[in-house]
Amino acid sequence: MTVAFKLEGQNFTALNGGPHFKLNQSISFFVYCESDKKIEKIYNKLAEGGQIIFPLDKYDWSPRYAWVVDKFGLSWQLDVDKINNQQKILPAFLFVNDKVLKVKEAVNYYSAVFPDSKIIMEWPYDKSAGLPDETLLFAQFKLADHLFNAMSGTGEHIFDFNEAFSFVVNCNDQKEVDYYWNKLTSDGGNESQCGWLKDKYGLSW
């Protein structure tokens, strides 16, 4: 079964994919709630039957923030901050393990592939972290006029990008399909079936 729906004016599609791939924290939705009332309402709803990674509280990076895995296994990051854009729900990538140093590289790569791209914000680690210079903790960027967040997570993690979560590129013709297919499967990407592919960082398209 395939279900198409909208949240905050944004298009989503849900598929019945069977037990082969599990949603995990490597990809989440980052929601800019813009008010205490809204973040509390969303947090309480998503936490029902789910798992709280970061409880709703004040943190160094936000006056009110939470990270929740809902009862279906989908991860949500909630931030009370405002965003100067109509898009309030942003896909967020978490680069971990052998990819922890690759946020900047990946953001530059995707920005070169997609039109109407722009790097909006880059937040590097403090030098005290002992990581190479310019290693990014957080980045926000735009691809084809859609906003995304990317983060890195130090330490060992038991999850990584997989096919449970993929991104749909609506193309105008076969020439455009071929362009994205060739770009995203190059340099270590892999072809899959039925129009799916996995790029060199493990993200599915």
Functional labels for PLM-detected ranges:
Residues 1-23, 76-78, 124-160, 205:
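Conserved short beta-strand elements that form part of the metal-binding/catalytic scaffold
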Residues 6-11, 22-23, 28-65, 112-113, ...:
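Vicinal oxygen chelate
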Residues 28, 51, 55, 77-125, ...:
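N-terminal beta-strand motif that seeds the catalytic metal site of vicinal oxygen chelate
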Residues 39, 103-107, 134, 174-177:
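A structural signal for well-ordered alpha-helical scaffolds and beta->alpha junctions
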Residues 73:
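Short, contiguous alpha-helical
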